[in-house]
Amino acid sequence: MKPLLIFLIAGEPSGDVLGGRLMAALREAMEGHVEFAGVGGPRMAEQGLQSLFPMEDLALFGLAELLPRLPTLLKRLDQTTKAVLERTPDAVVSIDAPDFCFRVEQRLRRAGARMPLIHYVAPTVWAWRPGRARKVAKFLDHLLALLPFEPPYFEAVGLPCTFVGHPVVESGADAGDGERFRRRHGIAPDATVLTVLPGSRRSEVTKLLPDFGATLEILASRYPDLQVVVPTVPGVAETVAEAVQSWPVPAITLLGDADKYDAFAASTAALAASGTVALELALARVPAVIAYRIHPVSHALYRRFIRVRYVNLVNIMLDRPLVPELLQQDCTPDRLALAVDRLLNEPSARQEQIDGVTEVARWLGQGDVPPSRRAAEAVLNVITKRVIADRQGQTPGRSRS
């Protein structure tokens, strides 16, 4: 049997993780009768992908960073489109990175490409720019959604969309060992552990670290045994390590997910920047306070165009402020300390969050079929429907699968 050929496109680290897991799930489902081509990073390379070019070439930031790299990006756009047309894969699966991926897929449609075009990670039309749903429906065949409430937004405009579950479910966030963490780092069994997560981008880290340090100064007077743990990532590790030296409480900095998830299991509560880590904390059942601070002009624009009331997906999914969000002018040491103190001091407040996030974790797919396997099944189902339609002579130039 001739193996399937799947062309994958990932443009950023989170997409590379999704791509690597999807490739593994496809290989398992097809018992090895599948080949891969496309663009990806180290996780996809581990699964056998030879990337057309370094995935880092597609990293897009602001306008100032984009303009000098525009010739390279246009070259990569041409290169990717040409590679798909030459290889004629059984399907194209693009993963997040919509600025690049959607341009490739639009070019493929204009060139008459007939293979299914599938996009993994639905655009957040429920939060802003709802008109994007109708636009992507013009060139995509299928969407794979991370959140359970997303499919109706796209099905309403005729684009099939499958909820596959959120990748955080496969992160291992709920598999940490708190006792192992305390032993490894010499933390007393009865010490109060607070995980502090100032973010992964330099801009957010530099804005939040001073407030977080001042917050800990307030908490230190109330909790003499307080032990702070600060998981970080390579891009900001040096900045974080330098900042925690002046904090009034002992702080352990960590690199790597395994130690981070053990820290979660050992923690009474967490203080975190808004982002995916809030979902990791939810899966690990760690009560949290979410903080964020951006430029006032950016915030004003955000409030004008964003259609949701919360920044944390837990609150968005529950449609209520279960997890405290302290943003902008509310993101002060006094208010942060008050919110964290409530979690550290009141078991009922912690349990209220744990009960709520347990429901969210179930909605995201925890305890069910792994998201990567669901995604693989959806991709193979789209391909199967296309093959059947081709045999019956019903494929006009694209399918709706």
UniProtKB/Swiss-Prot annotation:
Pathway(s) annotated for this protein in UniProt: Bacterial outer membrane biogenesis; LPS lipid A biosynthesis
Keywords per UniProt: Glycosyltransferase, Lipid A biosynthesis, Lipid biosynthesis, Lipid metabolism, Transferase
Catalytic activity: a lipid X + a UDP-2-N,3-O-bis[(3R)-3-hydroxyacyl]-alpha-D-glucosamine = a lipid A disaccharide + UDP + H(+)
Source organism superkingdom: Bacteria
GO molecular function: lipid-A-disaccharide synthase activity; phospholipid binding
InterPro entries: Glyco_trans_19
EC number(s) from the headed UniProt entry: 2.4.1.182
Class of enzymatic activity (EC top level): transferase
GO terms of biological process kind: lipid A biosynthetic process
Keyword Glycosyltransferase: yes
Claim: DNA repair is one of the keywords in the record: no
Family the UniProt entry places it in: Belongs to the LpxB family.
HAMAP family named among the record's database cross-references: LpxB
Protein's recorded name: Lipid-A-disaccharide synthase
